[in-house]
Amino acid sequence: MWTCLCQLCFYLLSTLAVAALSIAALVLYKTKPYPNIKRHKDEETFLDPHTIKTVTFPSLEDSPSLELSVIVPAYNEEQRLPSMLDECLAFLEQKSAGTPNFTYEVIVVSDGSQDATVSVALGYSKKHGAEKVRVLELIENRGKGGAVRMGMLSARGRNLLFADADGATKFPDYDKLEVALKQLAPEWRDDGIAIGSRAHLENDAIATRSFFRTILMHGFHFLVWLFAVRSIRDTQCGFKLFTRTTARKLFTSLHVERWAFDVELLYLAENLKLPMSEVAVRWTEIDGSKLTPFWSWLQMGRDLFMIWVRYLVGAWRIASIQKKEK
């Protein structure tokens, strides 16, 4: 009997080992090690509403010419975008008036929107000027991570913030992130990330969410910890501030373009040993979310596993390390 059990265990383990090796070989064969960042010609320019001319975006590889770039990824956000931009621009204008050397730009990235998102954003560009508000219109939907990346690659700031279009995070909390980032990285050439966090609100969220959604939330947090990021409690808050140097390293190495992109960014940051600070921010849930709890979190769980597997077997590599080695 014991002999049969041992043989059965041997066959099971052998089958699992063969399956694991097959998956690893398939992943290595079908996956490119570095991101292939393609950009349509029309995505290289923005419209200046005053001159009615198209202007070429700068590059993230250029030296900075502003203090702050705010990247706002937007997919079908004609309803929620105005209130977010109103709060954002009012805060930035007030900060600019009180601090003359504080200059900024807001880049709204329409991620293949089918509604009036582009028209709404262009209205703000016309009102405030293309020096302050620019609209990057992606030809096809890339996903939130892809939209953020395209905005980052087009930015002029010493520091770069991405902020969700729903306005769930109170924009004046930017000051908290700025203070935290300066402690990590006094200059834009230094590395650092200040990460807006809702972790302090978790108990309140549990009190108001259904039991099912609470289970999903804890399950997702566990998967993030297991497969990817262990030093940051809230990886998904859409309010993160990077130095220009750090943005170059991370967004040229990013593979995931959809919802789990935040996790890969922070996974990369941990592996590159970049300084990070998690900062509590004010956050309110806004109606109109594009996420459907079960299916979106199932997709993110799959993405987390694939992030882990691909880096583990060497199918994905970090582009910034490749550049350094050259």
From Swiss-Prot:
Any matching Pfam family: Glycos_transf_2
Positions of transmembrane segments: 8-28
Pathway(s) where this gene product acts: Protein modification; protein glycosylation
Signal peptide boundaries: none
Cytoplasmic side: 29-326
One of the record's GO cellular component terms: endoplasmic reticulum
Further comment: 'Wollknaeuel' means 'ball of wool' in German.
Record protein name field: Dolichyl-phosphate beta-glucosyltransferase
Species in which this protein is naturally found: Drosophila melanogaster
Taxonomic lineage from the root: Eukaryota, Metazoa, Ecdysozoa, Arthropoda, Hexapoda
